[in-house]
């Protein structure tokens, strides 16, 4: 499809006079348009769930989350990858963001980089892509050559491929095992896909990466438990987390945390299953470190 015919490139009737209205009215128009984004993302629930389930399986076997995009889409991928490290305590090499043109393109556009089909494949080759990896290709327009080239190569290797676009029947979707297409409609400012399209992509990435981490057992109930209490403030926070999900007093939680050598999931398991450190450790090993599964089955 030609660029001019893409939904993301059409003029939005709701904002056609946005340059002449009051500032309050301008903001209202933006808010009303943004409300459509969540509905568009909601229409992709089944596809997003499919992406999470398979990505979680691959990740559990040692696969990496690898994000691939250009411009705003690339920056959103880099952002999601970077935030997983401090949020869930994963190693930086398990979540990697690739942007057309390299790291410098995060701050300044690199002309022509997104139009190079070979570049996407080359960037993945440099990471020694393997069949357990998960490649998320992002393009609001659904047609970025850099992303298409990367997805094609990932498919050849046997990696799990996911595409995230904001148009229907996208080109990148034809090169992905799971195609997510949140059709948000024309942008408030014509063609400015950092707006509604960017918001939709961020929401979808939040869902996928959070879902994958939940399936790794890094969340118990709705609390992040894979925290590293490396100082007194974090030890206090960890003990409060343990207390909140076990109904133990904070003092009991703190004592158990010490016995567990500052391992929060282990401390929670010890309290919830009324077991000692060694017994709790065996249970966690039996259920791949997933506290929720331990509690459900014991």
Curated annotation (Swiss-Prot):
It catalyses: N-acetyl-D-muramate 6-phosphate + H2O = N-acetyl-D-glucosamine 6-phosphate + (R)-lactate. GO terms for molecular function: carbohydrate derivative binding; carbon-oxygen lyase activity; ether hydrolase activity. Residues 55-218 form the SIS domain. The keyword Lyase applies. The active site is at residues 83, 114. InterPro entries: Etherase_MurQ, Glucokinase_regulatory_CS, MURQ/GCKR, SIS_dom, SIS_dom_sf. Homodimer. HAMAP family: MurQ (MF_00068). This is N-acetylmuramic acid 6-phosphate etherase.
